[in-house]
UniProtKB/Swiss-Prot annotation:
The keyword Amino-acid biosynthesis appears for this protein: yes
Catalytic activity: L-citrulline + L-aspartate + ATP = 2-(N(omega)-L-arginino)succinate + AMP + diphosphate + H(+)
Residue positions binding L-citrulline: 90, 95, 126, 130, 181, 190, 266, 278
A GO CC term attached to the entry: cytoplasm
Entry GO MF terms: argininosuccinate synthase activity; ATP binding
Pathway: Amino-acid biosynthesis; L-arginine biosynthesis; L-arginine from L-ornithine and carbamoyl phosphate: step 2/3
Main localization, broad class: cytoplasm
Protein name stated in the entry: Argininosuccinate synthase
Subunit organization: Homotetramer.
Entry binding sites for ATP: 12-20, 39, 120
First-tier enzyme category under EC: ligase
Binding-site residues for L-aspartate, renumbered to this chain: 122, 126-127
Length: 409
């Protein structure tokens, strides 16, 4: 679709520097009506300034929606049922938010009769892929505008100059400087850019927004209990809470105990490596609790199969394939494994650490009678192990015999 053919576009709008510049750029370059959509995913910011900024630039249709419960219930919790970590470390706080934003953006575009959607992701990052794969999965004929791939504002310096020229307010950090590139929601916050672009440079404490330093955390552990039903957390310290409220409370506890910091160099889907500082206090606690719950409720082979599939599942979410058939297939398998993951986990939070100190479940596969060092009263016949060992040793013995005759093992 040519520039002149775009009459109305729905912009995923945070109210930050990038999307505020994009809003004005769309108006001046495309000459089209811009509809803004701001999703409240628990980023912890007052969203009214985003509305006022949009009004300042003459936007008539402004959508600001509270999606926190939907975000946690339908996106975060399903992901945590899989104990999802990208490259063994990243809890996917940014990745998991994009499908929901894109989904609602497409719904709004159809409702207001827009002929295009736009986002503020750069041409170097993963988010452009995540947004657009979701757009096309939900509306195959959608027109997508990606300003970072079109305009000549190819650096933060040029972006700031454009903002000053068009009188776009520029946020400052605590030192009065332009802020890091930040993404935040109820699950996490991330910081990138500036001095963090050098992976050898340690981040200043000012970078961290969601956690205190573990060194500054209390000298006494905080003890908590999390209740699970079918793989999802439902209560904290015996009090039933909504998904978003529970995660928010875990964030508070994690923050106070210095939990959830990660300095990560990751492999982006587009091919380059990038460095980010991630803070996921509540998610780090939740992951430890869920894994502990599974240790007594999942069958060994079922658990090992699930663990073997997790990296692929994580990769699909990281790369933007939330709405793909393969992600849905894996989700069905993961959810099937969670029917018995019900019970209570007790944890200690201490100076950046999450320590499981107890777990119990009505579906526990842990049988004290079988595993005890004391008299098991015939629950387990130790002599049965002889045949088990001999059968498992058979191929090793045969291989060793061949090896002695000069053959290959």
């Amino acid at each position: 679709m040519a520039v002149k053919d775009v009459k109305k576009v729905v912009l995923a709008y945070s109210g930050g520097l990038d999307t505020s510049v994009i809003l004005r750029w769309l108006q001046t370059t495309y000459g089209c009506e811009v509809v803004t959509f701001t999703a409240d995913l628990g980023q912890g910011e007052e969203l009214e300034p985003a509305r006022k900024k949009a009004e300042m630039f003459g936007v008539k249709e402004i959508f600001v929606e509270d999606l926190r419960e939907t975000f946690v219930k339908d996106f975060v919790f399903p992901m945590f049922r899989a104990n999802t970590l990208y490259e063994g470390q990243y809890l996917l706080g940014t990745s998991i938010a994009r499908p929901l934003i894109a989904q609602r953006q497409i719904e709004i575009a159809e409702a207001v009769g827009a002929d295009a959607v736009a986002h503020g992701a750069t041409g170097k990052g993963n988010d452009q892929v995540r947004f657009e794969l979701a757009y096309y999965a939900l509306k195959p004929d959608v027109t997508v505008i990606s300003p970072w791939r079109e305009w000549d504002l190819t650096s933060r310096t040029r972006l700031l100059a454009f903002a000053e020229e068009h009188q776009i307010p520029i946020a400052k950090d605590k030192r009065g400087e332009a802020p890091f590139s930040v993404d935040a929601n109820l699950l996490h916050s991330s910081s990138e850019g500036k001095l963090l672009e050098d992976p050898a440079v340690a981040p200043d404490e000012i970078v961290f927004q969601r956690t205190i330093s573990p060194e500054a955390a209390p000298d006494v552990a905080t003890e908590i209990a999390i209740d699970f039903v079918s793989g999802d957390p439902v209560a904290l310290n015996g009090v039933t809470l909504s998904p978003a409220t529970l995660l928010a409370r875990l964030n508070e506890l994690g923050k106070a105990n210095g939990i959830g910091r990660l300095d990560l160099v990751e492999n982006r889907f587009v091919g380059m490596k990038s460095r980010g500082i991630y803070e996921t206090p509540g998610g780090t606690i939740l992951l430890a609790a869920h894994r502990s719950m599974e240790t007594i409720t999942l069958d060994r082979e079922a658990g090992h199969l699930k663990d073997s599939l997790m990296p692929r599942y994580a990769e699909l979410i990281y790369n933007g394939f939330w709405f793909s058939p393969e992600r849905r297939m894996l989700q069905a398998l993961i959810d099937e494994s969670q029917h018995s993951v019900t019970g209570r986990v007790r944890l200690k939070l201490y100076k950046g650490n999450v320590i499981c100190v107890g777990r119990e479940s009505p579906h526990s596969l842990y049988d004290t009678r079988v595993v005890t060092f004391e008299d098991d009263e015939g629950a387990y016949n130790q002599s049965d192990a002889l045949g088990f060992i001999k059968l498992n040793a058979l191929r090793l013995r045969l291989g060793a015999q061949i090896g002695r005759r000069g053959g290959a093992l």
